[in-house]
């Protein structure tokens, strides 16, 4: 049930986010679609960092809650609020001040540039709220309560769709309209999840009078959350080079890529629900002293995430043209998008072996080495690929093939490390207990 609710939550979040692109593509034209799509890497970069930070909060709360350390849970909840808020405000400032420079780095097409800058600046107004929603969602997920965040996500998501239609069709705000709708809906979801935390009767309840940074707890949050956030950011940083490669083609290819890339978020986030469940369950069972359930949690999560990636990716491969038609009515843009779909359709499931294993290592408290492996296998490898293989062939397939290749390479290294980390972590349960005097 825990995994199913997380799956629905992640899938709904992606579908609501896709409504931005669908509304702007269908009602504001392909140029607006390309403008929004040109910002997706930066949105993924910064939101991915916040999600990684919240994963650290999730693991720490789950461990303390599983071990019944109520005081530590309380300290984590109140310290994490300030950490999350600070991260959201920092990203807001970066988005407002740095958007033009960031888009110039990617050689964004001139006809797409003004709309892309406007979208980023308005969208980033909701970053503090997004950070607070992820904070609340992480805490509820850590203790096994996933339905409340799902309900709040539904409310905010429906509001997002209605505001998208209102701002774009009625107010003719186009790019600014969908960004503003996202920011408002993020504020609503943050308010609802924080309000719910203040009304619970347990050690994870939020009391604004107790909000303070406990130094030791904050250090633990950052030790778990920053590597996870950095890992997510690394993927986005590497993808900046990929987006620059896409931008080296004409605007038509950029627009087609923008439409097809929505499938990445839909499928990957659906799979990510099982990664969070894996880390949370492994951390809880490890903290509760139940080693038999630790390994079982990993294999179940791996099987589910692989299956979801295979089914959704295969469906995308078969119904790709119908999927792309949700975002544009132009046949040439759909044809361009199908070039990405043709390569990626059956590649998504490969990433399960990498990401689920990383989540499992994090659930055992191992964060540094998995992050280093991701940096080498995903970031460094992808950059090398862009400047060698893609530079040689300069075709769209030669660019997109780096995804499954980097996932495979990184997965092998992560699995080898996890086997070692698992054996080392389980020693605590096999060591003989000292005899009583």
What kind of feature is each model-predicted range?
Residues 33-93, 130-149, 243, 256-314, ...:
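Small-residue-rich hydrophobic transmembrane alpha-helices
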Residues 28-41, 116, 120, 179, ...:
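Small-residue hotspots at the loop-to-helix junctions and early N-terminal turns
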Residues 45, 160-164, 190-194, 266-269, ...:
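Hydrophobic transmembrane alpha-helices of multi-pass small-molecule transporters
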Residues 8-20, 122, 156, 185-189, ...:
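Transmembrane helical elements of multi-pass membrane transporters/channels
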Residues 3-58, 226-246:
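Signature of the first transmembrane helix
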Residues 15-34, 103-110, 166-173, 233-266, ...:
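Helix-terminus/linker motif at the lipid-water interface of multi-pass membrane proteins
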Residues 3-4, 61-126, 170-226, 282-347, ...:
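Short alpha-helical transmembrane segments in multi-pass integral membrane proteins
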Residues 54, 123-141, 149-157, 178-193, ...:
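Short runs within selected transmembrane alpha-helices of multi-pass transporters and secretion channels
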